[in-house]
């Protein structure tokens, strides 16, 4: 016996839940099948007496992320600003350098040119890439066949710029520079609004968090849908050979629907058997797109002692020996439950996963004591962490990355329906893909694709723009005249070379005119 409905949504993360809510609000009968014993997917809010609540997964929202802000507001959630009142720290070669603003300052003029050229070139290249079809960029194949490591080797002349650029890649996509396609990474940064928007706290992707945690987005939609959300129901089989689509779960329940939305990371499609088999390109694509590696760590203290030293808690930490490359203040908005959140990224997540939880905490505290110059960092009162690499129903975090050569070959099939199966998930978004914002965009777009297939809305309503949030307005990202026009290091060297040649020629001409050159 099967359970009948209009649409089965596979995956109860933010994308699947956003899709289910829109379809439910449109009068359709929806069932959500979630593999875990909770909704939320790659968002996960843990609650206990020691932490009150803590986001162990996706957490941050900011200006231009208007869909998640609208949905959360509709669900009665509020945001608060991540603390960035005091100074940030850039820790490099064993020394801490306090600063303000999105990027660490650089005092060496040659190094400054190199840093400036890197950020500018990233944004310039990004402007060449269409957000909805990166494979259509003029140099798509050339850039896709190149790793980010190869691009950094071409762009960065100084070790300082290369180190910070490498950290930027590690932090943005939880992968190593040699693992990711340059085209894909350039697209990823571009569709998040560029280098400054993606990396910034104030006026950027990390500006805010939800009071009570981001897990509430999915939980509150589950409250609205009631028993239509089925937990501990991993989907193992989808059959499209009959009049309706049959969906079978691991505990052998059968669900019958007119349409299916797959709202799981693309590679997790390999856990599902399909009849008929998936088309060739999708079948191959899902074997080629892994997720990043990250352990999210939150160290709790008696008080936010770093603020007494005029530090906000943001640390950018260079160096192979440092377990964590980036931190933010995770203290509650009321000033209690003082904490520092840090990411163990990419290969370091794989390496440090061999240690015990206690050993990781010790390494983090020793690092924070060194960077902050405070022994108070050695006295934590509590510790929480989440290793997303071990999650069988995520496969990693934050998101799927594309190795070289894959995006131009297979990217077109990411959102392409397979008969009556439509695809959501943050990976299929065109704006803030990889974030909660992208998850909402993708879920609602997939839901509207089904509404269009059912004849309920016209095709031109599938993709909808979102009005700017009145509560979290975006300020424009600006650059100075100098930042736009300063030469790169090779540009400067060419300039010096030309100037030298010109000067020598001019001197020779003058000497000749004045009869100072003697023929031998």
UniProtKB/Swiss-Prot annotation:
The modification N6-acetyllysine is found at residue 52. Keywords: Acetylation, FAD, Flavoprotein, Membrane, Mitochondrion, Mitochondrion outer membrane, Oxidoreductase, Transmembrane, Transmembrane helix. It is an enzyme of class 1 (oxidoreductase). It is a single-pass type IV membrane protein. The record marks 156, 365, 382 as: Important for catalytic activity. Changing residue 297 to S: No loss of activity. Gene3D superfamilies: 3.90.660.10, 6.10.250.130, FAD/NAD(P)-binding domain, Guanine Nucleotide Dissociation Inhibitor, domain 1. The modification N-acetylserine is found at residue 2. Residues 517-520 are mitochondrial intermembrane. InterPro entries: Amino_oxidase, FAD/NAD-bd_sf, Flavin_amine_oxidase, Flavin_MAO. Its main location: mitochondrion. Residues 2-489 are cytoplasmic. Catalyzes the oxidative deamination of primary and some secondary amines such as neurotransmitters, and exogenous amines including the tertiary amine, neurotoxin 1-methyl-4-phenyl-1,2,3,6-tetrahydropyridine (MPTP), with concomitant reduction of oxygen to hydrogen peroxide and participates in the metabolism of neuroactive and vasoactive amines in the central nervous system and peripheral tissues. Preferentially degrades benzylamine and phenylethylamine. Belongs to the flavin monoamine oxidase family. This is Amine oxidase [flavin-containing] B. It comes from Homo sapiens.
